[in-house]
Amino acid sequence: MPLNREDKQAVVAEVSAQVAKAQTVVLAEYRGIAVGDLTKLRAQAREQQVYLRVLKNTLARRAVEGTPFAPLAEQMTGPLIYGISEDAIAAAKVVNDFSKSNDKLVIKAGSFDGKVMDKAGVQALASIPSREELLSKLLFVMQSPVSSFARALAALAEKKQAEAA
């Protein structure tokens, strides 16, 4: 069913609001994907707070006009699903992980930090650990010397007690 003008304006406004908050946009061709698989992809995207939507390319072009993602308009051809996220790597990670298990989803392009990326660029972005993973690694690295020092002090205290007894 075709959208009337008001519906199109509402879609453009909704997508523009998402794009205004976004750090990353990923485009992927979804030709031939089963409905059940697409539903799984949408569920994974929701878990990661990724806005995932199939859009008419003309509406998507209007939504990205005047944003850092405007250069992506050249890539907006064919049946595309758009992944938009505030997290720098979430959209790339969700789409890339799903494309590994489903060869019918083909990453076409992406944009991060005002730069357009090809498939290899999106895959490289997806391979970066998330902020939470990096923070946990940093905490482990910072905690390791402290815990080693504490164990050394405890061993020294036990040794002193053994000598005193």
Swiss-Prot record:
Matching Pfam families, A to Z?
A: Ribosomal_L10 (PF00466)
Keyword RNA-binding assigned: yes
Picking any one GO biological process from the record gives: translation
Q: Which residues cross the membrane?
A: none
Coiled-coil positions: none
Where does it sit, as one GO cellular component term? ribonucleoprotein complex
**Mind listing the GO molecular function terms for this protein?**
large ribosomal subunit rRNA binding
Ribonucleoprotein as a keyword of this entry, yes or no, is yes
Instruction: Name the InterPro entries on file.
Output: Ribosomal_uL10, Ribosomal_uL10-like_sf, Ribosomal_uL10_bac, Ribosomal_uL10_bac_type
Q: Which UniProt keywords apply?
A: Ribonucleoprotein, Ribosomal protein, RNA-binding, rRNA-binding
User: Tell me, what does this protein do in biology?
Assistant: Forms part of the ribosomal stalk, playing a central role in the interaction of the ribosome with GTP-bound translation factors.
Subunit: Part of the ribosomal stalk of the 50S ribosomal subunit. The N-terminus interacts with L11 and the large rRNA to form the base of the stalk. The C-terminus forms an elongated spine to which L12 dimers bind in a sequential fashion forming a multimeric L10(L12)X complex.
Entry's family note: Belongs to the universal ribosomal protein uL10 family.
Q: Which NCBIfam families match?
A: PRK00099.1-1
**Annotated protein name in UniProt:** Large ribosomal subunit protein uL10
Q: Which source organism?
A: Burkholderia lata (strain ATCC 17760 / DSM 23089 / LMG 22485 / NCIMB 9086 / R18194 / 383)
What is the taxonomic lineage of the source species? Bacteria, Pseudomonadati, Pseudomonadota, Betaproteobacteria, Burkholderiales
Q: Which gene encodes it?
A: rplJ
